[in-house]
């Protein structure tokens, strides 16, 4: 059975640590809405074979918000799967930082881990810092990470606004 949790940044008390045992599954959605400034720090440990984590969520920072998301995903045993997928829209003078780290231990063979952070900037004064990292000590793994930060040009913004 999958444990599904939704947390709203700035409103909910978000636990800083999750530990998953054998065959446990966790779907974790983090949502940051406009007007919320906060730091979120998560440490997720997969210490039982067959454990699976799906983590991600949207953040919308159109004003002067300050948002930091720090995630450490630690694979201690093999046969586990983790996925991180964050997406942000940042405007105004907002500042967002994403610091993600996947650690795969030497004994964690057959690990599958994915990490992504994708952002759209709406203004020249908005700032996004994104640092996805992989720390892999095992040989037989499937791991990837990536990040994008792009700006919508004025024509694209006009088109979207004119369509509602």
Walk through the language-model features, giving the residues of each.
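Conserved beta-strand/loop scaffold segments within soluble protein domains that form the structured core
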Residues: 1-158, 162-163
